[in-house]
Regions:
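Alpha-helical and coiled-coil interaction segments, frequently adjacent to or embedded
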Residues: 255-311
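Sec-dependent N-terminal signal peptides
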Residues: 3-14
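A short, structured loop/turn motif at beta-sheet edges
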Residues: 40-42, 89-95, 142-145, 199-202, ...
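Intrinsically disordered, low-complexity N-terminal segments that are enriched in acidic
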Residues: 19-107
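Hydrophobic/aromatic-rich core segments of domains that either
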Residues: 192-280
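Terminal peptide-recognition signature
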Residues: 47, 154, 229
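Active-site nucleophilic cysteine motif
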Residues: 150, 154, 183-198
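Acidic low-complexity segments
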Residues: 76, 96-181
């Protein structure tokens, strides 16, 4: 009988064990290397690169910038983001720029934070405030009694409404209207739709982008970005990650109220305005290097690698 009960317990615990391979709880320590190669240039250009910085959950212990091109740091108009600005010339073609971080990251839970949450009620270019989103938000939250419950109702709605799918055209821009209509997309689309509904319900909500540091290995390449969101309820910020909840349904309850420790936030917000301003305008969101030459964007190859550190 005892053996049978043990087997039953393990059977029910198995999804949790499998899911835990994707997250680190508590604290994580890692090195991340963000490296890029300047493409062949025919004229002098301007290169913008997001810089990770410390906050209450993310301590940047070291941030070493190695560049053959002179650089300076600036901040965006909101003050939320730090940005590296360089002016590479044709002679710099093929040269490499490397940013090496050593980070201690804490698992993020519901938390209080200084600042004005009301600024996160404003619409953005691809996250509008409109009667359609207001009607959806009002319908979904009709039975909720406070903003935390409203946020949970909207989280559940987006999770049920959308499916993680990067096929076709239109995904990956963080377009709330696209997400609402297509019912599919990547992390930018999931969270754009969620943030739009929160704001339509008069709940401040914000977007961030960076990396998931793989939990199932201790070194290697990272393929690209990941993004997530937070909403403000009962004087605290509540972290959510709905696209990861869609990919890992067994963690859906966890991802309402938590971001795991194996993350690095690079930038926060949408429609990011910086001086000098790119000819293309504010950054929709800011993850990869952005290079412009003669007012036109030029692709930059970037690679991202990590190594987990002992404390």
């Amino acid at each position: 009988m005892k053996t049978l009960l043990t087997l039953i317990a393990l059977l029910f615990a198995a999804p949790t064990f499998a899911a835990d391979k994707t997250i680190v709880r508590g604290t994580d320590h890692f090195e991340l290397v963000y490296e890029m190669t300047i493409p062949k240039l025919t004229a002098k250009g301007t290169l913008w690169v997001p810089l990770a910085r410390s906050d209450i959950f993310q301590k940047i212990q070291t941030r070493d910038i190695t560049s053959p091109v002179p650089w300076r740091k600036t901040r965006d108009a909101s003050g939320d983001n730090e940005i590296l600005v360089l002016r590479p010339a044709p002679a710099d073609s093929g040269k490499r720029i490397c940013i090496r971080y050593q980070v201690t990251r804490e698992e993020k839970e519901v938390h209080a934070e200084a600042g004005n949450p009301a600024r996160h009620l404003k619409a953005e270019k691809l996250v509008p405030l409109n009667p359609r989103f207001t009607a959806i938000a009002n319908r979904i939250t009709a039975k909720a009694t406070d903003d935390h419950a409203r946020g949970k109702a909207l989280y559940d709605h987006v999770l049920a409404h959308m499916r993680y799918d990067k096929t076709g055209k239109g995904w990956g821009r963080g377009d709330a209207l696209y997400a609402c209509d297509a019912h599919t997309g990547n992390c930018t689309d999931f969270h754009a739709y969620f943030i739009a509904l929160c704001r339509a319900a008069n709940i401040p909500a914000r977007f961030a982008i960076g990396f998931i540091i793989p939990a199932d290995r201790n070194a290697g390449a990272i393929s690209g970005y990941h993004c997530w969101a937070e909403f403000f309820a009962n004087n605290k910020w509540v972290p959510v990650d709905i696209s990861e909840a869609d990919k890992h349904p067994e963690l859906a309850a966890y991802y309402f109220g938590h971001h795991p420790a194996n993350r690095l936030e690079l930038s926060r917000g949408r429609d990011i305005t910086v001086i000098p301003t790119p000819q293309s305008g504010p950054f929709n969101y800011f993850f990869g290097p952005h290079l412009e030459v003669n007012g036109k964007q030029v692709p930059v190859k970037a690679t991202f690698t990590f190594k987990r550190l002992t404390k």
